[in-house]
Amino acid sequence: ALRFIKKLADRGAAATVLGNHDLTLIAGARGLKEIKEKDRTQDVIDAVDGDDLIDWLRKQPLCLFPNEQTILTHAGVPCIWDAQKTAALAKEVEAVLAHDDLSVLDAFLAEMYGSKPDLWTDDLTGNERLRCITNYLTRMRLTNAEGALEFSFKDTLDAPMPEGYLPWFEFPSKAAQTHQIFFGHWAALEGRTISEHIQNVDGGCVWGKNLIAYRLEDQQAFSVSNPVM
């Protein structure tokens, strides 16, 4: 799948954003994350063109603007960031991931994993700052009203949630005031959100559910069931 998306992107027919599993693949390929069977990444690393694929992958964005009214990230945009701030902070991490000096990349990957800090402040610095940005854009599901992250919950919207925390998209969003937000990551949602300006396009396809597509031109959603599982 990665090779196919790269071919499409090379022709200008596709674009992608990085998610938590992509970062795990990159870290594993650099020898900075233990590769587990459930990650299903070893075949990519061992492929004849594996190095080229991973080098291409690490140079992809965390945040993409398909048009002037739309933001795409893997996990979403926290309520405390507007569109401009989201783009600027994403670029900070993207610059490190795509750095020509691989020691700069490795230094970040070695410190990328962790759930602290769990609340954004503008005075964060170094790898803590980069980790916090990465967690918001690739791991976020629940936050509190101040934007603090909660990582343990992965269930459906109907399940009980930790006190004080809600799905990030249930809080008034600065970015959604000016842009439509698209995200994946949270397969248990199966495409459900409560906001017309925030769309989930992870239908749980890898778990045997649906593959979701959304046509921006006319705001039309399409869903196809997984015929394999």
Positions of predicted regions on the chain:
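Active-site neighborhood of divalent metal-dependent phosphoester bond hydrolases
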Residues: A1-R3, K7-G126
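Acidic, His/Gly-rich catalytic cores of divalent-metal-dependent hydrolytic chemistry
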Residues: A87-M229
